[in-house]
């Protein structure tokens, strides 16, 4: 089964009109580098919204990736609801 078929069968996309999503062919992103997203056909798109603001320095930034990999060896996520954590405090 194609990725988009699995997506349409099992995923809900918030802030998306699902009727239109399900009726039309959609772009599937398979990779990203710097400020560009890459689809299944190898076409490149500018990530104009920085993947909703979480990638303002681009995808696969070496300094950021190194810090993420180091942090994953400690704790992947902890809530800020009543707890503090070292990386956020720095």
Predicted features and spans:
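Active-site and channel-lining beta-strand-loop segments
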Residues: 26-48
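Active-site-adjacent loop/helix segments that line or gate small-molecule/cofactor pockets in enzymes
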Residues: 1-31, 50, 75
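Residues in flexible loops and secondary-structure boundaries
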Residues: 19, 23, 37, 45, ...
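Short, functional N-terminal and low-complexity linear motifs
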Residues: 3-5, 31-39, 56-63, 85-87
């Amino acid at each position: 089964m194609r990725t988009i078929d699995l997506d349409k069968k099992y995923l809900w996309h918030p802030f998306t009109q699902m009727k239109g999503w399900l009726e039309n062919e959609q772009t599937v992103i398979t990779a990203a580098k710097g400020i560009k997203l890459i689809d299944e056909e190898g076409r490149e798109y500018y990530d104009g919204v920085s993947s909703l603001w979480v990638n303002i320095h681009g995808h696969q930034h070496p300094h950021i990736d190194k810090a993420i990999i180091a942090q994953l060896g400690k704790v992947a996520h902890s809530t800020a609801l009543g707890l503090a954590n070292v990386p956020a405090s720095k």
